[in-house]
Amino acid sequence: LTMDTNMAGIAFPQNYPRHFRRAVLNSSLEFAQTLLQFTRLTWLHEGAGKTHLVIKNSAHTARVALLLRLFPRARFVYLHRRPIDSIRSLVQVKQRLAQLVGLQEPPSSLRQVEETVAAHDQLQEAFARSRHLIPKGQLVEIAYDDLVQSPLNTLQRIYCALEIGGWDSARDAIAARIARGRAYQAEPVVLEPEAEQRLQALLS
């Protein structure tokens, strides 16, 4: 969590677009070195007896070239979700994090909607420009709704598409974890009426 990551825009929400361009769309050499060190330390701490490290970070959608340079055999899971749902959720997350760790007063929800829509578009454009760099067999695309509604089958599809071994031994543990989470109900994401109206207008 340094100023070279997307968390800079959370700490300084009044300058979110500038930090997004600097730290997400144009990652620095220092960030690459820090990411490599962080990944190695995480592996040393969590990777004993395991064969894969899974990183979930939407900012990496814009870092395909960097990730392949650092980890040539990296495999990618691209999650398709309705943009309006993704953006609405991210606006709420940004608002809450700004209250927890922000060093500035957060912008209005209306402004955050506009900035987040722009950032989402730039993120998708960056991925579209670089997806051809991903070698065959190292990318699988799945629908968010499939993951939510049929998690076990969707995860099996990921294992198969990316040729990850060990599904038979992992299946029961994954199924048990899914069963424990069945009682969870996601909190509805509700924006202020003006912000919601603006979001729908921008995506119409």
PLM region spans:
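PAPS-dependent sulfation machinery
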Residues: 1-53
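Short, solvent-exposed loop/turn segments at secondary-structure junctions
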Residues: 6, 59-62, 82-86, 92-93, ...
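PAPS-dependent sulfotransferases, especially Golgi type II membrane carbohydrate sulfotransferases
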Residues: 26-29, 43, 91-204
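Active-site-proximal structural scaffolding
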Residues: 28, 60, 69-72, 79, ...
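Short, hydrophobic/aromatic alpha-helical segments in well-folded domains
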Residues: 38, 63-66
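Short, well-ordered loop/turn elements at secondary-structure boundaries
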Residues: 46-50, 70-74, 136
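Short catalytic-loop micro-motif centered on adjacent basic/acidic residues
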Residues: 52-55, 141-143
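Conserved phosphate-donor/acceptor-positioning beta-strand/loop module used by diverse small-molecule
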Residues: 57, 67-92, 158
